[in-house]
Amino acid sequence: MSGGSTGERPFSDIITSVRYWIIHTITIPSLFVSGWLFISTGLAYDVFGTPRPNEYFTQDRQQVPLVNDRFSAKQELEDLTKGL
């Protein structure tokens, strides 16, 4: 079976075209800037529901929230999350 043409443009033709670079000189930096803003504004914490670095430990709870006994894990989790 010989290797036939699939009708697609060769990759070398794509990356040497002016249209490719006009499009990508806009999209690649804009993706970088939007990602940087997503992280630096703290929106990533809100979207994914993770606590901010200053919210891991409250004034009331300074210990690390670990579950020690797997058989009473539900009760331990309720005790740990009571103040949240």
Curated annotation (Swiss-Prot):
Known function: This b-type cytochrome is tightly associated with the reaction center of photosystem II (PSII). PSII is a light-driven water:plastoquinone oxidoreductase that uses light energy to abstract electrons from H(2)O, generating O(2) and a proton gradient subsequently used for ATP formation. It consists of a core antenna complex that captures photons, and an electron transfer chain that converts photonic excitation into a charge separation.
Binding residues annotated for heme, in chain numbering: H24
UniProt-annotated location(s): Plastid, Chloroplast thylakoid membrane
Source taxon at top rank: Eukaryota
Subunit structure: Heterodimer of an alpha subunit and a beta subunit. PSII is composed of 1 copy each of membrane proteins PsbA, PsbB, PsbC, PsbD, PsbE, PsbF, PsbH, PsbI, PsbJ, PsbK, PsbL, PsbM, PsbT, PsbX, PsbY, PsbZ, Psb30/Ycf12, at least 3 peripheral proteins of the oxygen-evolving complex and a large number of cofactors. It forms dimeric complexes.
Bilayer disposition of the protein: Single-pass membrane protein
Family indicated by similarity: Belongs to the PsbE/PsbF family.
Gene name in the database record: psbE
Protein name: Cytochrome b559 subunit alpha
Cofactor binding comment, as recorded: With its partner (PsbF) binds heme. PSII binds additional chlorophylls, carotenoids and specific lipids.
Native species: Thalassiosira pseudonana
Disulfide bond sites: none
Cofactor(s) listed: heme b
Primary localization: plastid
GO MF annotations, alphabetized: electron transfer activity; heme binding; iron ion binding
GO CC field: chloroplast thylakoid membrane; photosystem II reaction center
InterPro entries documented for this protein: PSII_cyt_b559_asu, PSII_cyt_b559_asu_sf, PSII_cyt_b559_CS, PSII_cyt_b559_N, PSII_cytb559_asu_lum
Transmembrane segments: 22-36
